[in-house]
Structure formats: C-alpha cells, structure tokens
Regions:
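N-terminal assembly/interaction segments in proteins that build large macromolecular machines
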Residues: 2-308
C-alpha cells in the first residue's frame, strides 16, 4: 500500500474542497490514486446529496453568460440553502459554469442540461458538477431554471444586487447596427429597465388576456365601490387600463434614467442615430427564490418530535 503523505491529502482537498479527514480516507481507500480518490469522494458526495434532498434551497444567485459578439446569451437560477453560501466564490463560480453550459450547449430543459457533458470537461456531466458542488459546499445545490437566446441581433444581460435579479433581453438589428455602441448601450439600458421596473410584456398585444380581464374586473369593482355612476364606470375602467398598460408594457414604461421618455421613444431616437431598424423581441427576468416557499423552522417542534 502506498504511503499517504500530508501533501497528497492537501492536494486532494484543494481539488475537491472536501473535508481533511474525508480526503485522507479517500486517499487510503484508493491506495493513493488521485483519480480514484476523487471518484470515491464523489460517490460519498452522492449519498450526502441524497440526505440533503429534502431540504429547501431558496437562496442562491442568478448568473449569466453571453458570447463574444453578443448573439447568444443565457441566464440561470441556481439555488442553495443559505445566503452565506450564495455569496461564496465556490458557489458563484459553479453558477457561472452552468450559465456558460446553457449558452454554449443549448439544452432543451433542466433535465437535458443535467445529462449533458460539461463543455469545459467532457468527462463530467452537469449532474456530476452539481454533486461535486454539494460535497464541496455542504448544502443542497439545485439548478432551478434557465433562459437562452440566440439571435442575429443583440442579446444583453444584467445581474443586479449580486445575483438577486437577472435579466436578459433580445433586440433585433442588422449586423452594422449590432456593432454600434449606442445600440449596445440601449440594449444594456433595456436590461437595467427590466430589472428595475418589472414589466410583464414587451407590448400590449402580449399582455396575458386572463390577467387583463381580471384587472378590468378589479378596476370596475373599485369604481363602483367609490360610488361612481354605472354609466361612467366603463370609461373610468378604460382610462385606468391605459395606466395599467404603462406599468406592465416595456415599450410604454417611462425610461428609468429619464422619466420624460418612454422606452418606445428612446428606441426611436437610438434607431435614428444609429441608422438602423430596432425592435425589442423578448425578455426574461428571474428573481432569486421567487415562488419558492421558504421553510420556517420550529425548533421546539423538531426537538419534541425527536424525543418521541
């Protein structure tokens, strides 16, 4: 049996971020072989990950990746259990790897992503990376969702508040316009706008019909509760719906950097200055943990259950 030195244990720990005693045992179990030791730790990590599967991962980050010419982009939400871990370099680095994978490998969905070979190391799948990260970080790690755009125009991404909010927007423009700095700035400003103002659609035609009808019902009930005459209620509702459109439609929102302009008028200015036709195709906005019910621990109840 090969002699296990402290240097061998240290090297394994640096490569895996696993605990010192686990690394020592892995070296012993693998007779000093590095690759077998890493495999042993990964197998151990899989059982650890299973123990963590029931935990709720509602913290984390939204990460992004765009290719060099800005024609392909991706945003992903990767979750962990605590805000402390979400701020660590290890976790953020892992999330960035996943964003790169989505952009370059174009998976159909999260399940397909998990099965893909990692673009930077084909000997591992993304599922392997998740398991490795779980071992190294010590919390449940999960890839929740992603969005990917590919275009002949411009894709711009923006990450706000250290990964709490992530935005991606696609703008159509010809090749000459894509290289224009004003167009690039406009696309970036759009991403900022979406992060701050939370639009629900690009234009009126894209507003969810069911949600719009519900809004009309609410506005009508409000007007009637205010004692307004029935004959003017419909006109009031239409007026308030106009205001609603200005809140939820990106093109009709006031520009966050200049409230005297709408996004539509700003786009017209940029198109004229750049000598190019511009249009906003779509956007994605992810907010970390939205829709996930966070666990509320009841320590007394847990202790009582353990003593039964």
């Amino acid at each position: 049996m090969a002699a296990i030195t402290s240097a061998m244990v240290k090297e394994l720990r640096e490569r895996t971020s696993a605990g010192m005693m686990d690394c020592k045992k892995a070296r012993v179990e693998s007779d000093g072989d590095m690759d077998k030791a890493i495999e042993w730790l990964r197998e151990k990590g899989l059982s650890q990950a299973a123990k963590k599967a029931s935990r709720i991962a509602a913290e984390g980050v939204v990460a992004q990746y765009t290719n060099e010419d800005g024609t392909v982009g991706a945003i992903v939400e990767v979750n962990c259990e605590t805000d402390f871990v979400a701020k660590t370099d290890n976790f953020i680095g892992f999330a960035n790897k996943v964003a790169k994978q989505v952009a370059l490998a174009n998976p159909a969905d999260v399940d397909a992503l998990m099965a893909q070979a990692f673009v930077d190391d084909s000997s591992k799948t993304i599922s392997d990376l998740v398991s490795d990260a779980t071992v190294a970080i010590g919390e449940k790690i999960s890839v929740r969702r992603f969005s990917r755009y590919e275009t002949t125009g411009v894709v711009s991404t923006y990450i706000h508040l250290g990964g709490k909010v992530g935005v991606m927007v696609e703008v159509t423009v010809d090749a000459a316009g894509r290289a224009n700095e004003e167009v690039k700035t406009f696309a970036h400003d759009l991403a900022l706008q979406i992060a701050a103002a939370k639009p629900e659609a690009v234009r009126r035609e894209e507003v969810d019909t069911e949600k719009l009808e519900k809004e009309k019902e609410i506005l009508r009930a409000q007007a009637l509760n205010e004692g307004k005459p029935e004959k003017i209620v419909d006109r009031m509702v239409e007026g308030r719906i106009e205001k609603y459109y200005k809140e939820v439609c990106l093109l009709e929102q006031p520009f966050v950097k200049d409230g005297d302009k709408t996004i539509k008028s700003l786009m017209g200015e940029i198109a004229k200055a750049a000598g190019a036709e511009l249009d906003i195709v779509k956007f994605s906005r992810f907010e970390r943990g939205e829709g996930i019910e966070k666990r509320k621990d009841d320590l007394a109840a847990e202790i009582a259950a353990m003593t039964k």
